[in-house]
Structures are given as C-alpha cells and as structure tokens.
From Swiss-Prot:
Pfam families: DEATH_SH3BP4, SH3_1, SH3_2, SH3BP4_C, UPA_SH3BP4, ZU5. GO terms for molecular function: GDP-dissociation inhibitor activity. It comes from the Eukaryota. InterPro entries: DEATH_SH3BP4, SH3-like_dom_sf, SH3_domain, SH3BP4_C, SH3BP4_SH3, UPA_SH3BP4, ZU5_dom. The SH3 domain mediates localization to the clathrin-coated pits and vesicles. Residues 54-113, 649-719 form the SH3 domain. The gene is sh3bp4-b. This is SH3 domain-binding protein 4-B. CDD domains: SH3_SH3BP4 (cd11757). Homodimer or homooligomer.
Amino acid sequence: MAAQKIRSANTNGLPRCKSEGALIDFSGVPDPSLSEVKVLSPSSLRIDNPASLENVKEVVAIKDYCPNNFTTLKFSKGEHLYVLDASGGDWWYAHNTTEMGYIPSSYVQPLNYRDSCLSDSGMIDGLLESVDEGVKELDLLGDWTNSSNQDSVKKCHNNPFLRPSVSNPFLNGPLVPQTHTADTENSVDLLLFDPLAPSHAIASETSTDVLLDLLPNTSQNEVTVPVKRDNPFFRSKRSYSLSELSVLQAKSESPTTGSFFAGLKSPAPEQFQSREDFRTAWLNHRKLARSCHDLDLLGQNPGWGQTQPVETSIVCRLDSSGGAVQLPDTSISILVPEKHVASGETQQISLKALLDPPLELNNDKCTTVSPVLEIKLSNMDVQSPLTLEVRISVALGGNASALNMVGIKCLRSDAKEGPYNSVTQIYMYGDTVQVKLDNLEPVMYVVMVAQGQGIVSPSSVWEYINKKVTVGLYGPKHIHPSFKAVIVIFGHDCAPKSLLVNEVGQQANKSAPVTLQLWGKQQFVLPKPQDLQLCLFSNMTNYRVDAGDQGKMVRGFQLKLGKVSRLIFPITCQDSAQLSDFTLRVQVRDEAGGVLSQYCVQTPQPPPKTGSKSTGPRRFLKKKEVGKIVLSPLALTYKYPTFQDRPVTSLKYGKLIKTVVRQSKNPYLLEYKKGDVIGLLSEEKIRLKGQLWNKEWYIGYYQGKLGLVHAKNVLVVGKVKPSFFSGPELTTGLLLEQILRPCKFLTYIYASVRTLLMENIGSWRCFADALGYGNLPLSYFCRVELESETERVASVLEKLKEECNSEGKEKKSFQKELIMALLKIDCQGLVVRLIQDFVLLTTAVEVASRWRELAEKLARVSKQQMEGYEAPHRDRNGMLDSEAMWKPAYDFLLTWSAQIGESYRDVIQELHTGLDKMRSPITKRWKHLTGTLIFVNSLDILRAAAFSTQEPEDCII
C-alpha cells in the first residue's frame, strides 16, 4: 500500500513489503540499474539512525493538512517532514519518522529553499534525464543546509530550457560546462506512478520558471554573469530567470558560421527602455524560435521532433446574448444564459480539461468519472449562474443496492488540490450530467465523481458501478523508419488530440519532450482496478513492434488512483525502402489473460518527399502497393474471435411523425406509418439526395427491415425500448444479413482479392470454417500438399469461387459469401479495404463514358488532366474504345480517393454526393451505392455487438 504505516517501534530490521512503485514492471526499460533500486526498511527510518536519512530531504510544513484519504499523510504547520520522492509534481512521497504517505507540495517548503532544485511552485522543473539520474536526483543537491559549500556543479538537464537538444534551436548546448558527475546511487523508496510520464506541471504549464539560483556558488566563478543585479527588469523572480537565461545563452554559445539559426539571437534587456518593450521582444523571439524545427534533432530521431504541446482547452468571449462554450473533441460544454452579463459587457470563459485528478478524489469510496475541469471567468459582475454539461464515463449497477449505495456527485473547489465540496444543484439524464454553477469565482475546479455511502472495507465503490476507461494510441504526425507509439489509459473519456510525452531512459538525453497526435481511441468497461497488459501488433511483417506481443503492464493501483498511464512501444521498419502506412492493433488483457478491449488504428502516411512529383496519371495498383492501407485487425495471428448471434442492445428509438409511401420503390429507403416506433442504429446522419434535393437520413430498423429514414420525420425519444415496438428483434445475425444485400451487385477483380487475402489471413482453417467448410480436410480444397499457409488460404478462396460459379448447386454470390466470412472472423479492416475497391471499380464501370462529368463534380479536374488519364489507354490511332472507358475512370477514382484520406466512409459518402450532382444521376437506377453507404456506417455497431466481451446489457460501442 502506498501509504503503508511504518512504526518506529518495529526494530526487527526486516524489509517491508514492496511499495507499488517497486512493483512496476521495468523489464521493457533498457537501463539495468532499475532492477537495483532498493526499498527502505522500517529500521532504516529510525531517528536514532541518522546515517539512514542522508538520502532524504527535509522540508517544513507552512500550513496544516488534514487528509481524507488513506494514501496521504497528516501534518501540522511547522512540522518537519522528509521527502523520499519529489517526481510526482503536485504530490510528494514523504515520511515523518512514524508513517509514510503523500503530501501536497504546495503545503511545504524546503529548508534553505533558494539553493534547492525545487521551484517556488513546489514542482521539479523538468523530468530526469535518465533512470540513473532518477535515483541520483532524489538526493536533491545533497545536504540542503550546506548546499553552498558543495564543490560539484549540479547538472541542469532537468531544466527544459537547458537541455542539450530541444525543439528551440537557439537553446542548443549546455549553459554551464559539466565538471563533476552526480553522486552514486542511493537506496531510496522509489514510488513511480508512471515511469514514462512527465509531471502535470510539465504537461500543462509553460516551462518558464527557471532559477539561476539552481547553480551552486562555485559555478559563479566559472561563468561571468553579464547582467547587473540592480537592473529593474530583474526585480521579479520570473523575469530574472527568463532574461538572464537568454543573455547567458547568447554569451555562452557562438552560433556556427553560416548556420540557418545564426540570425536567431535572443534580445538583451539593456537594449530596451522599459520592461514591457523587453517582454514583447522576448516573446516575439521565442515564438519565432519555436516555429523553427531543430534539423539536427529531426535527423537523429525521426518521428520525435514534431512540435510544441497543445492544451485541451478553449477560450471564448461572449456578450449579453449568451451562448455555449464547448471543449473541443469532448462532450463537455458550458451554457451561458441570455443577460448573464449586463448589456455592453462581455464575459471571457476559459475551459480546460486536466488529465490527472487530485490524489484525494480516488479511493475505496470515491472515484472520478470525468476530467477535472478548470473554469476561469473574467467578469464577476454577473446576473445569472452558468450551466455545466458533462458526459460521464460510468453507469450505475442495475440492482437496487447499487442505486442506494452509490451516487453521482459534482465536486467543486477554488484550488486544484482541494478541498472539494459537493454541488447540490445537479441533474442527470442518461450518461449526461447538468450542474448549475452559482457563487461564481474567477477560477473554479469542477469534477464528477461516483461516491459511495456506507461502504465498508474491503468493499469499494467499484463493486457498484460499471466504470469506463479510455485507451488511446498516440504517435507522430508522420511515420519514419524508426519511431515510437504510445498507448495511454485515461480514467475518463476525454482523450486529448495531442499529448506531451517524455521518455525516461538511456536515450532521454537525445530527444526532447514532444507532442504526439491521437491516432485512435476506444472505451471499455473496467470491472475492477486490476493489473492490465497492453499489447500492440502490426499487420505487416515489415514493421516490428518491440515487446508488442508480450505487452507492457499497467498496475491496478494506478487505475484506482485515476492516474494517466503512458506506455511507449518502439516501432522499426525492417526495409526502409518499403516505408508506407500500416495498421496497428491495440489489445488490452486482464489479469487472467482475457481480452477486455481491442481495436485497430491506421497509421499516418510517411512525410511527403521534397523531390519533384510525377504529374502523370496514377495507374492500376502495383502488387507491392496493395498492402499499404490494409486495415486488417488480426493479420498474422491465428486465433480469431467467434461471431455471436445476439440482440443489438445499443439501438436508440424514435417516433415517426409522418407517413411515407414511395411511388418509385427503393430497397434502401424505408416506408413507414405515422405514430409507429422505429429503431435507430445511431444518431449519425448520412447525406443523400431524395426525390428533389439533398437530405439528412438516419439508418433505421422498421418492421424487420433496415434502411434509411428522413431525419426530419423522426422524433428521437431515447434508448429505452417502447413496449409497443413492433416487428422482430434486431440481432447481429439479422443485421449482418441486411447490410450484405448490396454486396452481390458490386464488381471485383479476382486477382486483387486473392492477393489481399493471402497477405492478411493467417489461418486457412479459420477462414474455411467461416465460409461453412467446417471439418473438411485440406485435401478437399487442393489436390497436392501445400506447405505455405498463404497458398492454403488461396486454395480455399479458389474453392469458394468454383462453387459460386457452378450451375449445379444453389446459386451463391462470391462477394457476399466472402464478406460475410471475413466479418464473422472480425476482419473488418480487410472488409472495408475490399469494399472500397469494389465500389470504386463498380462506379467506374457504371459511369464509363460519363466519367469526365463525375471528375468535374468531385475534383474539378481540368481538360488537360482528363486527357492525361485517357492517354495510356488509347490505341495506336489515338482512339479510346467506349468499352475501355472504365479504365481512365478507375484511374481517376483511385487517385481521388487517395487524396480524400484514409476514411472509407468519407470516400463512399463523397462519391455518392458527387454522383447525385450529375445530370440524370446514375444513382437513380443504380441504387446499390446507397446500400453500400448503409453497410460501412453499420459495421461498428455490428462489431461491437457481435464481438463484445461484456454481457449484452453492458455492451460498449
């Protein structure tokens, strides 16, 4: 237990149980010194053994602290405490010679603090440069009371401004020459929530709190400070740090002659007449420097030197008319009523989501179900309260005891560390909470929690709720021959679009903290806090994920405390000549090895080449290009999940407010009667042309049939199924049969299909079983023994083609049977790749000679470009046969779809919209593209219901 009490009466000298920090799996970290970290014994903390306290640092409490959490330590003002680990940012791990626990860093002050390596905010200025330093830096400048007498110069690599290699190119190189190394390893109780995660201070605050007092007095003889101490710019501590650092940096480094960054010189304060002028010049210089990439860093570490971090925040200014402020990419918003401020005045609202919650909010009786929200207001002269709307990531248990024992509450505080008080005016509907915020303050912190009443140990609040956690995959903007992907687990559904990541290890001194982009995320229900194993697989043998199949561990206590966990997976390309985007599969396993969640993510493209681009038309896919954008979720693995035919419980329901009977029948547009109830697969809308103009449509289920219903004709009533809902229940088997209707009308190229399946199906036996060839031997599919698994897969596919083309048996559709089999073994990524190819080829054949009109609607292609597409297909006389018109059309559609992006839904949606815009659109007679649009928008619903590891009522989409 992190806050395990250690009694001074215990003198047996036996080592105590390992702390949670020591339980972290460091097997994946290359530095062997982590395995040598020792844990303090109880006897080593006795006061009568002063030699044991050489490795801990003494602080004094500046205010009282009374905890309400078993992991924190109680102390009074003036009491002396001893810090064991100060890497936690807002919370330090300390002891008072009697017991151990966490203390808020803002409540204590180090002795002789001006010479310590702690900033005035109580946070470490930067992450440690290596794992060895992680142990050495806990000796926080040796004896704090005698730090001025030290002979060694302390390393300043903790400071992000003083790193030897950072994204600001004008800060390259050390500020002070290193004369001595740090002391040897110390035996300390190293408690690391996440050894790969930066502190919250680094992620959310600008690293400008730099103190030159960090340098010991002995170093002042080596470096002459060319700044006068009576300069008025340096009366403020922060301004002193920034300005003197800039001057010292400019003096200590001579830029290389002819360097690109030679002109980026930091301004000197003596050049300006006022503090404000200097501040403006310094900020402009800093902005210019940050806009420049460190080319040396990009060359050494491709894929890491990307950009500066971006916060998940928003700032809006509203007038007396009111409005709403929504946090980007989240379901969090603030509703501002009309006349909130007086006429002519404005209210500026800043909304920010803090990823890590305060430690005291997560324990046996309480757990956070939303991020901590920081709300800042500029105008306190208000006439009405605000309304905060948050979607929570939890569902209360279905039994009556859970509803009585646990409730959703909103807590509010004026400080991030607390204390937090309950807000009474709270309203819930479904998974959305509305909170009325009155008694407004300039800065407020709000969080939603699930809090238990009368819960007695060993029970916890987790036993009465179904809490959802989010697993996200982050990576660089462009992939490189060697890069790193990061799997992150959040205790809520707010996964930011970008994330600052520091790697703590032997290579940390070669790469600066960087911002990675969110590639994909998924939510799943975590039944209880437990150790989770996270694995990462690649679908292409050309890419190797280090420790991806064995996985990396996230400890249960980290999840219980709501900490954000970051796990880094290095990825290397075996052959850089074939560098291309590929698919990664994220898998989360529980303690017993069962799969809790898995999903697939398509990586970004490699960086564009700077050379001259070919202006010629794109030809047919070459064989080596086929596997570039395959989204196979289970490639190269032989264990496929089982398709389960069970009810689809994620439907929403709506009441039909209009009767529709169609004169021209369309198999994909529903007919319905006013007053009936219809099931909706989701509230996402599809854009489609109706009888006269474009409309928005829902995918609905009515009277046993799946199709589109005009959104204006449906009044959505919620997730509860009405008792008078008629028609058969929608199951995964029925849904699969309904969405496969258009597949048999699509055109395909067999050679391309065969190549894709050979590259992405890992087991012929599973493939054959899914096609209905259960218990048939391999000899049924091929006459000779085949050694290669890919050839066996090809033989099964060939057998399917023969049976579908034979006249003796019942006629079957090759496309439909193939797609159905792939969906039953959860190869959704491969399915959408095939469907997109089928749709593009079928459209090219259907459009044929009218492809030029379609090209104008989709991309406004010039006449010269059209000639370029047709030129390769003309005969010797320069003529293009009408029967060959599909070839330039197919070339164009392939090129156009690649420019749209990786979203197969967007490609098919935009293609349908472009066809609708044509004169006498072919979609009037060829309606199966509409069915394909329904198909691709229903896949996620089908997969979530058919392969969910939860019970049907707990199904997570």
